[in-house]
From Swiss-Prot:
Family: Belongs to the DnaA family. HdA subfamily.
Keyword presence, Nuclease: no
NCBIfam families: DnaA_homol_Hda, PRK08084.1
Subunit text: The active form seems to be an ADP-bound monomer. Forms the RIDA complex (regulatory inactivation of DnaA) of ATP-DnaA, ADP-Hda and the DNA-loaded beta sliding clamp (dnaN).
The protein's name in its UniProt record: DnaA regulatory inactivator Hda
A family per Pfam: Bac_DnaA
Record flagged with keyword Ion transport: no
BP-aspect Gene Ontology terms: DNA replication initiation; negative regulation of DNA-templated DNA replication initiation
InterPro entries in alphabetical order: Chromosome_initiator_DnaA-like, DnaA_dom, Hda, Hda_Enterobact, Hda_lid, P-loop_NTPase
Key words of the record: DNA replication, DNA replication inhibitor
Length: 241
């Protein structure tokens, strides 16, 4: 079963943002595929003591949120203060939640495309970026569904700022890499996913990794409940395929 890590963030502006991050989305559970250089750059930024900025972009479901969750988990375990702002859930909070985040060790802004054209959010992110530059200590990670220059931002200065740092496209996994990622996730959860079962899932299901991981969790639970090993006939029975 999936569990979650709660991180409480209290900024100097006295705004509290509780973060609920899946505890299985770590660097150890991320299968890089063709993204080894991206992963190395990200981990290097987290190791350094001064500020650093990386922008990651990809289509939805490629793993960019996983990497931000992993970065938050790694620094949280070191005792550092982190902030994670999922802009696809921006109705949960207001732009002022960014006030004071330049004092944190790490700030992660996920799905920036969701606030394109929103003047208040764009200005809040722009101001935070400038404060982070001045502080010289905070690491900033931002994700989007396209390169910075292609975001439909209303604030040209923000588009320019986002284009300053290291920019990486998160490459999609091949089917072979997806199989490896599924088997890795299974091992971390304490069970084995036979290769033939993994290939069957890739053939019969949506190949989007989030869907595959959810299905893997479902099969794990069903296997434990029924006290049966994962086989293709059992998978067909559970998933009614």
């Amino acid at each position: 079963m999936e569990s979650w890590i709660e991180v409480s963030l209290n900024t100097p502006a006295q705004l509290s943002l509780p973060l609920y991050l899946p505890d299985d989305e770590t660097f150890a559970s991320f299968w890089p595929g063709d993204n080894a250089s991206l992963l190395a750059a990200l981990q290097n930024v987290l190791r350094q003591e001064h500020s650093g900025y990386i922008y990651l972009w990809s289509r939805e479901g490629a793993g960019r949120s996983h990497l931000l969750h992993a970065a938050c988990a790694e620094l949280s375990q070191r005792g550092d203060a982190v902030g994670y702002v999922p802009l696809d859930k921006r109705t949960w909070f207001v732009p002022e939640v960014l006030d004071g985040m330049e004092h944190l060790s790490l700030v992660c802004i996920d799905n920036i495309e969701c606030v394109a054209g929103d003047e208040l959010w764009e200005m809040a992110i722009f101001d935070l970026y400038n404060r982070i530059l001045e502080s010289g200590k905070t690491r900033l990670l931002i994700t989007g569904d396209r390169p910075p220059r292609q975001l439909k931002l209303g604030l040209p200065d923000l588009a320019s700022r986002l284009d300053w740092g290291q920019i990486y496209k998160l490459q999609p996994l091949s089917d072979e890499d997806k199989l490896q990622a599924l088997q890795l996730r299974a091992r971390l959860r304490g069970f084995e996913l036979p290769e033939d079962v993994g290939r069957f899932l890739l053939k019969r299901l949506d190949r989007e990794m989030r869907t595959l991981f959810i299905t893997l969790d479902q099969l794990d639970h069903a296997s434990i409940t029924a006290q049966r090993k994962l086989t293709i006939p059992f998978v067909k029975e559970i998933l009614t395929l």
